[in-house]
Amino acid sequence: MLVSRRLPSWLRQNLGEGGGHGETAGLIAELELETVCSSAKCPNRLECWSSGTATFMILGNVCTRPCGFCSVPKGKTEELEDDEPERVAEAARRLGLKHVVITSVTRDDLPDGGADHFRRTVEAVRQATGASIEVLVPDFIGKSGALEQLLKSRPDVFNHNTETVPRLYRQVRGRKSVYEWTLKLLADTKKIMPGTKTKSGLMLGLGETREELLQVFTDLLNHDVDFLTLGQYLQPTL
């Protein structure tokens, strides 16, 4: 049972449409794009959209993984939209983005997990803009050749989130996700394309201990991960 508690002032945000929020939202609607900001009901999206920032979500808006922390819809997926890469590129161009983040739902139903669609999207954005490009990818577990196919597009940053410590993996990420595979995916990226920066992130406050976090930090260092983000889990809202 969820208990409603008063949030501290620094977590509360106005729901106004001022600044660039309306412009960003309008463009996303016009081009019929998905963003993780909306699909995951991120509580920070008003702040991000007001500054012209958005994380584009490709491969549809229905995920094949039932991660407990995420509000993205789960269920029956739809066919890929062939012109989606060009629409993402057009949005990035019109927003004047200097750094573009492309993420996706997990598509276990696709033979390559959506890797080639990622490749096409990165290439379209690069052709349309001078922005640096970061991909935040699912694990592609069991998808032979998927990582190699995606990396043909040479993203500037390859991001795959660890999310939590190994002890909590099944509870937080579901039975299909494997901690060791996450580390392998990040390490294999460096082997295939040494010049690519790798990145991972964790949510704090899910019941992990300090010692468990330090072990994950060590594991990521040992697998040549360049960047680590740490965030506090905020329940999906709005």
Residue ranges and their predicted role:
Residues 28-31, 154, 172, 220:
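Alpha-helix boundary/capping residues
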Residues 51-157, 162-168, 178-195, 200, ...:
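Conserved Radical SAM active-site core
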